[in-house]
Amino acid sequence: MQRVILVVLLLSCMAVLSVRADNSEMLAPPPRPEEFTSAQQLRQYLAALNEYYSIMGRPRFGKRGDSFRKREFFRTNGERYPEDAAAWTEFQ
């Protein structure tokens, strides 16, 4: 029984890796010709480049962790602010 589970796990890993490898060609930028011979060729290249950057330039939310931890870097002289420094009741 353990061999069957191991074989199924191995085959699923290989299937996932093969699917990921097939999509890797989509991540490559379009090939740039040595010389543009016509305006149409330049338009096609720029359209392909625009499509590439529209896919690759999308923000990936949640991949960088908690950005609030970085606020400590911008404080001068290590000063600390109280948690309730700006309570809404003070402005009413």
Swiss-Prot record:
SMART domains: PAH (SM00309). It is found in: Secreted. One of its GO terms (cellular component) is extracellular region. One of its GO terms (biological process) is neuropeptide signaling pathway. Residues 1-21 form the signal peptide. One of its GO terms (molecular function) is hormone activity. Highly expressed in the abdominal ganglion, to lesser extent in the pleural-pedal ganglion and much lower in the cerebral ganglion. Its main location: secreted. Pfam families: Hormone_3. InterPro entries: Pancreatic_hormone-like, Pancreatic_hormone-like_CS. The modification Phenylalanine amide is found at residue 61. Keywords: Amidation, Cleavage on pair of basic residues, Neuropeptide, Secreted, Signal. It comes from the Eukaryota. May play a role in the regulation of viscermotor functions during egg laying. Belongs to the NPY family. This is Pro-neuropeptide Y. It comes from Aplysia californica. The gene is NPY.
